[in-house]
């Protein structure tokens, strides 16, 4: 039963225990295992794993991301190919007809980026959710976020995932935010750009 289950679920641990590293199909490695064992893959099958990562960039290989959280993905800054591929492979959990315009707090109390290990930082969760939600918006709100500030600014992120992470994490902030100013500026922005009602954010 155990062997049948392992085969059907395509778990990688039996191959690892049998030292069959070069026989591993990284396209089938589950998302959690891909994160947990990536250093072991590099250590025991450096050439094969390197080819796999290069394939992610070219689009000839694939990665799974169904069981990882956005903040777990952006912590892989030392594996940019894997991070980018897993980010793009994430399922879309935003219901139809719902959209979020993120207001991101990047103040010092939120911690820091790039920890890689250790406790999850609130900033990592804020940045990852902000990017995840903003890129799913429509019209002028796609890739847009609002700074946590007394004078909130509507800003865009662009480039690859690392570039967007940096842009959002280094945005200007203050000790408090003016919610009324956010709504006022949102209304002015929508009127100026003739945004349709169905393209307006439903949540902030």
Locations of the language-model features?
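Long lumenal/extracellular ectodomains of secretory and single-pass membrane proteins
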Residues: 1-125, 135-204
